[in-house]
């Protein structure tokens, strides 16, 4: 179900909004552009469409490709913003557990144990969670679960840390728990107000994300602006606490071998978050930021396009070679690759066959 957002509680709105908020982005068919080519043997075999925005430290658009102003769903790329909202509402998490609250985790034992710990601190249990039961997101972890005959679990589902943190935030404020995922719940009203505050625009639509939580529609430009405000915030603020926790505990926010964790390790000071359906956002401490949406949701395009966007933002390309794109195989040997279009990456990070 998709709905136009209701007017937020005035008290919550006043508490959460710290800057002017523009009108909601238009709900329209996005005017995506080619962002990556599938090159095999020197021939363009396929094209991935999408949109890219690169922001300077002062918030101005340095580069754009496609449609950066249409309403879209950031999916899990919005989790750092949701975590900021919970800290603003009194959630006392820090360190690896705060990183887990903003995670799309792989379902490793450390993620499950961390989620249990958040619930214990809140005086709650797994049965209080309302996210959907699922197998672990990480392929290797999921395979081991299947071999062991383990069943889908709310704790293993990749958003469980966020849901545990939402429950604790609700409990701390005396809000009801059973309906914490209702968009009209005070917790979700606080999240919506923080989304609007950090993106600088009204929410266009509210629907339900895969985990069951409300999902807020903003623009790609707004998503980049939000992460820039998080990474450039003053020390000690909720924004700075979220950014610091996710950077310091990158694998807690994702998992072993995940590209977003590797990207944060490779680029000093970078905060990065991915989302289903080909979404990526990343920002540096000075406020430079990028956001990417791949129209067909392909991760094979998301990673190299995000790397090329970071190079456009001024990141040393030598730090990004690991993210230049997976090879295309022919007969078991590399014969090409997925490469950002020339408009985005005039000097490709890697050669294609």
How does the language model describe each region?
Residues 3-5, 9, 14-29, 96-203:
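Active-site-adjacent helix/loop patches that line small-molecule binding or acyl-intermediate pockets
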Residues 74-91, 110:
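Active-site SXXK
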Residues 48, 63-81, 96-97:
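Short active-site loop at a secondary-structure junction
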Residues 4, 9-69:
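Beta-lactamase-like hydrolase cores
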Residues 185, 202-251, 281:
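Penicillin-binding protein/beta-lactamase superfamily catalytic region
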Residues 44-49, 78, 274-276:
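Short, flexible loop/turn motifs enriched in small residues
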Residues 231-353:
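Structured C-terminal helix/loop/strand segments within mature extracytoplasmic catalytic/sensor domains
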Residues 65-73, 102-105, 148-157, 208-214, ...:
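A short glycine/serine-rich beta->alpha loop
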